[in-house]
Design a protein with these regions (language model features):
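Short glycine-/polar-rich loops that comprise or flank the Walker A/P-loop
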Residues: 210, 240-243, 268, 458-460, ...
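Helicase P-loop NTPase motor core
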Residues: 213-214, 220-226, 492-494, 501-587
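Conserved helicase NTPase motor core
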Residues: 127, 136, 140-218, 224, ...
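A basic/glycine-biased coupling hinge at the interface between accessory DNA-binding modules
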Residues: 135, 143-176, 181-182, 234-408
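P-loop NTPase Walker
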Residues: 16-18, 23, 30-37, 44-52, ...
Length: 685
């Protein structure tokens, strides 16, 4: 069937189209020079209009496009329109049945996902939305027409809602499921650890995102959450023991976690290991030779002697090296050196050994060539950094030769080699769930190992437990932004906060939390205490009052109570402790640095050394150019890491903290704490 413009109508209209032909499932609109084929599946509306004399047909298409035919005889136009409209409506009804079936399938899939007994992850939402878009693309009807049909309207709107508001609906589904699950699985959460898990711990354990960061404040039960997470995966059948990997930063922490797993899960098949043990395992699986860890890594005294000896040797053999080292130590570190062959001074060599150890460790951790390391420095720093690299180069060469002669590897080499095996596909990761403790201490090198493992299996999940408020290891390469910008590095996921501490009272928590959050870059979180405290829970005291304080404590502290005495440096250990066993025989006193106290707790804590100066707290910035380039970029907030270090010290205590300061040169932290309401009595109360 065809409709044409009249001769006069065609002449007067001067329009590109003058005829329309009805096809099997569409129309063909054409003119002398133009032709437009419009299938019914692109047609949104057909309109028949009457002008002054002639008829007009309008075909509405997507994206507001309209094709018009002018100059047709009016009665013929009406007749053609009725026939066309009937054919179009008949086709549309048939296609609406097809569309209805597709939409019903999509809605059924959405409902199944929304109400399944499990976590609704971001990845699952992406798959649902991809299915909806694919389903829409396969529909025979234009989307804009679906609301016309009763069989399609509601399901189409539901699909559309999941495209536009999917994240909100996903969160609602997870909230419902979590509430139901915590009630249904109460017996599990009450018995999986020695004490029942609290709601925030339970919510972290059941979170099934592919990347989960659990912010675990001091004393909030992070190890319980890690153990419970592994148990939950097994309990739910989401993983076999061999598919779960737990990672800790130190051997002792890994052993403690394994002990907890054996005790609570009654299995040896789920194992915690250090990053170095993981790298060693990967290399062993890919090589016939079992790697030997060098004595340079396992024996600290031997390592420092090795570095001192080779440093002295290079200064002996090359005057230019000796001159360069003199310049470095005097100008940058402000050390006073003896005249002449300063490198032969055994005290100086011993003092420098620790620095050489750290600098070489950073170079080994970075890996790559000298030119690759140079590229890390900015234009202003590069010339001096290059000089320092040249001075360190003989030590690096001697280190590598010693490893080769020993047929051994160091820890940095282990991780570099493991990442290389993973990237080349020589090792296929069996782990679908990676659980990491103390995540705030992770370095870029270790993060690369995690990323390499996850690239092997895009569906693998990362469950990271840490606390950016306790990040105190930048000097050894830890990168805080791997925690504070977690999603940028490890993908979109979820952040959970453990909101209850079982260690310190409310007053200690209040002071510590307000003190640490004076730095706006720290992640915001609430940490509630179960016990109240009073103003005496945190006290500023002059450092001369230490003896008087211990005298006072000996009158009421029980022998079972632990008193932790903390300082920024080892050499600040007070001499009074040498006579403590006889003067205060019933006081359980332990001294350590604040860094060493991480993970410890005590009934009472005494923090020493809140004074200004070279060994002050906060410590003055004394980074060499080598550290400035190879370590993660410093934070803009003043003394950010030192502030976190004092937070760690404060939060070791259960009942009471005394902060001892210098009256003549008080630390800037003293004023900060006093303004937060910490009292400054003249004598111990």
């Amino acid at each position: 069937m065809e409709l044409k413009s009249t001769a006069l109508g065609k002449h007067l209209a001067q329009h590109p189209y003058n005829r329309v032909q009805l096809l099997n499932a569409g129309v063909n609109v054409s003119g002398d020079r133009h032709e437009y084929l419009i299938p019914f599946n692109q047609l949104l509306a057909i309109r028949c209009k009457k002008g002054l004399i002639w008829g007009e047909l309008e075909f509405e298409l997507p994206e507001s496009k309209v094709v018009r035919l002018h100059g047709t005889e009016w009665q013929e136009t009406q007749q053609f329109y009725r026939h066309l409209f009937k054919a179009w409506q008949s086709w549309s009804q048939e296609m609406s049945d097809v569309s209805s079936a597709v939409l019903q399938r999509l809605v059924d899939e959405i409902s199944e996902q929304e109400h399944r007994d499990g976590w609704f992850s971001r990845q699952a939402l992406m798959r649902v939305q991809q299915e909806i878009r694919a389903g829409f693309a396969a529909l025979p009807l234009p989307l804009a027409r679906l609301n016309e049909f009763d069989a399609c309207r509601d399901n189409y709107q539901q699909c559309l809602c999941w495209l536009e508001q999917g994240e909100a609906k996903r969160q609602q589904a997870n909230q419902r499921w979590t509430q139901t699950t915590l009630v249904a699985q109460r017996a599990f959460f009450d018995t999986v650890e020695s004490s029942p898990l609290n709601p925030s711990q339970c919510q972290a354990v059941v979170n099934g995102e592919n990347a989960v960061l659990v912010l675990a404040g001091a004393g909030s039960g992070k190890t319980s959450v890690l153990v419970a997470r592994a148990a939950w995966l097994l309990h739910r059948g989401e993983a076999s023991p061999q598919q779960i990997l737990l990672l800790a930063f130190g051997r002792q922490a890994a052993e403690e976690m394994n002990s907890r797993i054996r005790e609570r899960l009654d299995t040896d098949d789920v194992r915690a290991m250090t990053f170095h043990a993981l790298a060693l395992h990967i290399i062993q699986q890919c090589s016939r030779k079992v790697p030997v860890i060098s004595r340079l890594e396992t024996d600290g005294v031997y390592r420092r002697e090795f570095l001192s000896r080779h440093w002295q040797q290079q200064c002996d053999e090359k005057k230019t090296q000796a001159k360069g080292w003199r310049q470095w130590l005097t100008e940058e570190l402000e050390w006073t050196l003896p005249e002449g062959n300063f490198w032969q001074d055994s005290v100086l060599a011993s003092r420098l050994a620790g620095r050489l150890e750290r600098w070489l460790g950073l170079m080994r951790m970075q890996g790559g060539t000298q030119s690759e390391m140079l590229a890390l420095a900015d234009d202003e720093t590069r010339p001096l950094f290059q000089q320092r690299l040249r001075l360190m180069a003989p030590l690096l060469k001697a280190w590598k030769k010693a490893l080769k002669d020993e047929g051994a590897v160091d820890f940095s080499g282990l991780i570099h080699q493991a990442v290389n095996y993973l990237d080349k596909g020589r090792f296929v990761s069996p782990w679908h769930h990676i659980l990491v403790d103390e995540f705030q201490d992770i370095s870029p090198q270790r993060a690369r190992l995690l990323e390499a493992l996850r690239r092997q299996s895009p569906e693998s999940s990362l469950f990271a437990v840490g606390d950016d408020w306790q990040a105190i290891y930048r000097f050894s390469g830890a990168e805080l932004t791997l925690t504070t910008a977690f999603e940028q590095h490890f993908g979109e996921g979820a952040q959970c906060i453990l909101d209850t501490t079982y260690r310190f009272n409310h007053r200690i928590g209040e002071i510590a939390n307000r003190f640490i959050q004076q730095n706006p870059a720290q992640l915001k979180k609430t940490l509630n205490s179960l016990r109240d405290g009073d103003k005496k829970s945190v006290v500023l005291l002059e450092q001369e009052q230490l003896d008087a304080l211990l005298d006072k404590m000996s009158g009421y502290v029980t022998p079972e109570a632990r008193i932790l005495i903390l300082a920024r440096y080892h050499h600040l250990r007070p001499e009074v402790l040498d006579k403590a066993q006889t003067r205060w025989p019933n006081l359980h006193l332990d001294f350590m640095t604040i860094h060493a106290s991480k993970g410890q707790q005590a009934d009472y804590v005494i923090v020493l050394g809140l004074h200004e100066g070279r060994d002050g707290f906060p410590a003055p910035v004394r980074e060499s150019v080598l550290e400035a380039v190879l370590l993660p970029r410093p934070e803009p907030y003043p003394d950010a890491e030192e502030r976190r270090l004092l937070y760690v010290a404060l939060t070791r205590a259960k009942h009471q903290v005394w902060l001892l300061y210098s009256r003549d040169e008080p630390s800037i932290f003293v004023d900060d704490l006093h303004q937060l309401g910490v009292p400054m009595p003249r004598k111990p109360g």
